[in-house]
Design a protein with these regions (language model features):
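Carbohydrate-active catalytic/glycan-binding domains of CAZyme proteins
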Residues: 1-110
Length: 110
């Protein structure tokens, strides 16, 4: 495998990229939400379509949302991520899962 790093000016810790149906999807740690970026080109997320697909609201798992991963499993979209309860710190970290009810992972109503 040859390696040619792609440099980005965008701050995106814990990046996760998935290629599905001819499209690239990017997720990364934002801290307070789950956001997906969509691009036709893995080298250009600067001009990506962006969608916040989930906010913790009253679920009690904010602000420590990090390391999200988007997966398409058996025809359904899932996001696995870590979360922590406010005020409890790293000891409260848990793996959480949200599932889209739609075929489009970018749909915030999913």
């Amino acid at each position: 495998m040859s390696c040619r790093p792609i440099h980005s000016e965008i701050d995106m810790p814990d990046p996760w990229v998935l290629h599905a149906n001819g499209t690239f999807y990017l997720m990364f740690t934002t801290g307070d939400r789950l956001e997906i970026w969509q691009s036709d080109n893995v080298e250009d997320f600067q001009h990506a379509r962006k969608s916040v697909v989930w906010r913790p609201g009253g679920s009690g798992w904010a602000p420590g949302i990090w390391a999200p991963e988007l997966h398409n499993l058996f025809g359904a979209w899932y996001i696995y991520f870590s979360g922590e309860r406010p005020g409890e710190g790293p000891a409260s970290h848990r793996t959480l899962i949200v599932r889209s009810q739609k075929n489009d992972p970018m749909d915030p109503q999913g």
